[in-house]
Amino acid sequence: MGRTYFVEEAVGRYLSDLSVKFKPYVTGLLIGQCSPQRDYIIRAARTPPKEEQKEGNTSPSKLDSIDEEWFTAHASQISRMLPGGLLVLSVFIIATPELSKDCQNTLRKLIFSIEKSLTKRRLWKPADEDVSDRAALQICSATKKIVCRTYDVQDPKGSAKPADWKYQSALSASWLSLGCTVNVNIHIPLLATSPNHDLEKNTKNGLNRWSKQIEDSIFLINGQVKDNDIELLEGQKKLRGNTHSGTQIFDVKVLTQLSQGSSHRSTATVQVCSGSINLKGAVKCRAYVHNNKPKVKEAVLALKRDIINTLSDRCEILFEDLILNEGRCKKNFERVYHVLPQRLFVPFAGSNVMLSDYKFGDEAAGEIQERFVEMLDQFVQAEDIHIAEEVNTVGICSLSEKMDDTQLEQLTKATLLLKLQQNMGVVIAVAVAVFASIFSFNYFSD
């Protein structure tokens, strides 16, 4: 028996409009949530036209002219704009009858291309209960006939399976929301033995280690540790103060493991470092889960992935911005601070789920509005843009002269990293009030 996709009625109206406006075909992405029992589609977005296509509402006449790289880049951009629990779940083609016989092969190719691209960027590990089926939706623009099939992205040689496509009103109008603030303080050493420092690669390696801590953390939901296999709403009373527009909100605290047990011993290692990357700040995280008796483990998993994704995505955006505006970072600063982009949330009609995006301090609301139109084909009112985090001013200090041998020796001693036995029994916590997520590069010249 194939999977069943429950689809927001507004998605059906959007697809119907596209079938009238664009000929001979139009492609796009479908956004939703997987669960063991059923899947949900709550949003659709057509592929943005390339520059040469913006003059008119026409597409190339053949499906083999679809730019796979452009399509995949769109999926990567959209994945950054999704809170925890949501993912790019499906691809669609609306085409004339003349092109129908080639649609499924094209959809299959696009599904696996997207999965390959998104998997490269992920820092979290797939769970055993993750659903690996992705839908390929084909609609005939003349007859409106719908063909929905699924492909298992873990099985490239597998064949398509039929799936049901059912529209439902107010599908995500009362989904459950989980939110938390995570304080981040990540130190990533840059080894002196490395001939040159690939900052992006080193940052990703550091985030990989940090993501394992998040995955091993304990999550308190409304102040309680809940068993993974119970329903999220079990024992939960719906209070007036805990709802907003039909949304039940859960406040989550993340308890990160600071030390391992005495059975986990490690030998001391010394690393001589010529610099470091430090990530410090507080990040706002949010996840949504369906209201069809979700389990605690579904909700916690969605929030864990949002925590990991939001920090990883911000670092990617920052590096892209540095390369675009400044060229590759040069190793000529003693200490350089960069502010990571802030997170923001925007609503969309008919749902209590909010979409996400990121902005640098100098970005105007108009730029954010343009991005939502281009990426999600959605107009956003400026007053509906909710900035989740505040920003502090940071400075840049440059190295004016080379250090002598004595200074270098002192500096080297100061940057020795000792991985000592982890059951020391004493933990010193230093609280730092940081409102923004601040990204600092520390460079030490030799």
UniProtKB/Swiss-Prot annotation:
GO terms for biological process: protein localization. InterPro entries: ODR-4-like. One of its GO terms (cellular component) is membrane. It is found in: Membrane. The keyword Membrane applies. It is a multi-pass membrane protein. The keyword Transmembrane applies. Pfam families: ODR4-like. The chain crosses the membrane at residues 81-101, 424-444. It comes from the Eukaryota. Keywords: Membrane, Transmembrane, Transmembrane helix. Disulfide bonds: none annotated. May play a role in the trafficking of a subset of G-protein coupled receptors. Belongs to the ODR-4 family. This is Protein odr-4 homolog. It comes from Gallus gallus (Chicken). The gene is ODR4.
